[in-house]
Design a protein with these regions (language model features):
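Transmembrane helical bundles and short interhelical boundary loops of multi-pass, membrane-embedded
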Residues: 310-312
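Membrane-integral, polyisoprenol-dependent glycosyltransferases
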Residues: 4-8, 12-306
Length: 312
């Protein structure tokens, strides 16, 4: 009960979006309440299409956009009156923009990314800044950029992104006092450290795997169906040989593909650490999974068309 009252003080930016849309519509109703999520999903899909079309081709970009838009978990979040889709869109768009910034050798200030990070932080807290900065930083480090330059460049971005949230947090602290501060620490620090004073969505690590498999329905069925059409070869060589080939494959991977893979691996691993786990936490990896799934569908079309026919 006390935490329920404290949560009421955390008015998120998606709530302001609902208020703005409802003002234009003249009333608060189910339509205006769900509109921010729908608009956020639309923006995320369109930006993702442009991002991949430029780097990997229009065909794979279009298929990835359709897969993102129509899988169960993203579709559910896109029509719900919740903060999750707004957070996801802001994080994913920031990830795209920070990649483009890296292509420009980290020159200038990625203002679109900064604004998206600020909106993500206002939606769900510091994680909206930390994760989108961590992924491109790791990517650039793997590609041989100097660590100190990467660190200070993304530190600058993070500091700029904290300006707007800091103003809001200060105003909220003036109104809520220590109760608000306790809530912020509980939700953003103690949750990650597993030291929350109350149980909140506690699940084992395998729960995240299960939610992604279920959340990507119906396309997980395509993956299962295709297994019966693939050709398998007996593994040859030692484990060390396999590992060397894997490392070489990663090093030679196209930049956009490697970046998409890192988005999936880092974000997924991050959310496996805290005890608190929910399916919606993993929404930011869905557009990047869609990219690889789109490539797989194109592969099946050329090599194993019957798998697609059986799927439907």
């Amino acid at each position: 009960e006390p935490y329920r009252r404290q949560r009421q003080m955390c008015i998120r930016d998606s709530h302001w979006c609902i208020a703005a849309i409802s003002t234009v519509a003249g009333a608060v109703n189910e339509y205006t309440s769900r509109m921010p999520s729908a608009l956020a999903l639309s923006a995320m899909v369109l930006v993702g299409y442009v991002f991949y079309a430029k780097r990997r081709g229009a065909e794979v970009a279009f298929i990835a956009a359709l897969l993102t838009l129509t899988n169960f978990e993203v579709h559910r979040a896109g029509v719900a009156c919740r903060v999750d889709m707004v957070l996801t869109a802001m994080m994913v768009i920031a990830l795209y923009q920070l990649y483009k910034w890296g292509e420009k050798d980290l020159k200038g200030v990625p203002w679109v990314a900064v604004l998206c990070l600020s909106a993500a932080a206002l939606t769900k807290g510091p994680v909206g800044i930390v994760l989108p900065c961590l992924v491109p930083a790791v990517f650039l480090w793997i590609r041989g950029r100097k660590f100190l330059r990467i660190f200070f460049s993304f530190l600058m971005v993070a500091v700029l992104a904290c300006v707007l949230p800091a103003v809001w947090y200060w105003a909220a602290y003036q109104q809520g006092g220590d109760h608000f501060l306790d809530l912020v620490l509980e939700e953003n620090v103690y949750r990650f450290l597993g030291k929350m004073t109350y149980a909140s969505h506690e699940n084992p690590a395998w729960y995240n795997v299960m939610t992604v498999v279920a959340g990507y329905a119906p396309y997980t069925l395509l993956g299962l169906v295709s297994l019966f059409f693939l050709r398998y070869r007996k593994p040859q060589g030692r484990v060390r040989t396999w590992w060397s080939r894997f490392v070489a494959y990663i090093r030679n991977m196209d930049d956009a593909r490697l970046y998409s893979l890192l988005c999936i691996v880092i974000i997924f691993t991050f959310y496996c650490i805290p005890k608190s786990k929910r399916s919606v936490y993993l929404l930011p990896i869905y557009p990047f999974i869609a990219y690889f799934l789109a490539e797989y569908i194109i592969y099946l079309r050329h090599r194993h068309l019957n798998a697609l026919r059986v799927f439907g």
